[in-house]
Curated annotation (Swiss-Prot):
UniProt keyword terms in alphabetical order: Carbohydrate metabolism, Chitin degradation, Disulfide bond, Glycosidase, Hydrolase, Pathogenesis-related protein, Plant defense, Polysaccharide degradation, Secreted, Signal
Disulphide bridges: 212-244
Protein's UniProt name: Acidic endochitinase Q
Record-annotated active site: 92 (proton donor)
Lineage, uppermost ranks: Eukaryota, Viridiplantae, Streptophyta, Embryophyta, Tracheophyta
Function: Defense against chitin-containing fungal pathogens.
GO MF annotation, one: chitinase activity
Annotated organism of origin: Nicotiana tabacum
Amino acid sequence: MEFSGSPMALFCCVFFLFLTGSLAQGIGSIVTSDLFNEMLKNRNDGRCPANGFYTYDAFIAAANSFPGFGTTGDDTARRKEIAAFFGQTSHETTGGSLSAEPFTGGYCFVRQNDQSDRYYGRGPIQLTNRNNYEKAGTAIGQELVNNPDLVATDATISFKTAIWFWMTPQDNKPSSHDVIIGRWTPSAADQAANRVPGYGVITNIINGGIECGIGRNDAVEDRIGYYRRYCGMLNVAPGENLDCYNQRNFGQG
């Protein structure tokens, strides 16, 4: 291809092609508006307290604040991470059986029903605990300790806190991001606790103290059901080790 313009014009042309190419590879190239609406098809049901809150634009704006989210690895890895993120957060915000189609009730809630603690669960990941609000706020540039309800009133902030939690290792827990893209290697302690790579250990990261190491239970099955549905929509295999039934939770070492 020949180019007869000035060097500056050539630079601008190349930069534009680089920029548009980069954007095309962003998370929006996989999670289109139509796919988002089909995945979370009942989120705006009139019976849902979150009706009208979780928008596609808010999700994309939040995701773009975390460049590695849904953009790391090959196409399969990216799709698998997106399925896993929405699988876990759909369970956290589920409204149950809103239609005859199973695992379509995600993103029905913004706030935890029990609001006795100031830092009760809010948003897609149901962010709880003052320490998490402080860390998330620092990471995304928002004062959440004194204004925790921003997580329930600003959809972009709400998604940002969920993605922050997803991308961030804490204490002896790896990040969910590292687990699902295959970057996590279990330590000796993890191996002794039966914590192995797969979707199941992400459940352990998020709510292992309640759901893991106690045998089969409906909560874990619900998380798996959402994940399988999204994997099907994204045309990716869910992989192995989907539950945490035999895993010791991270709080037990």
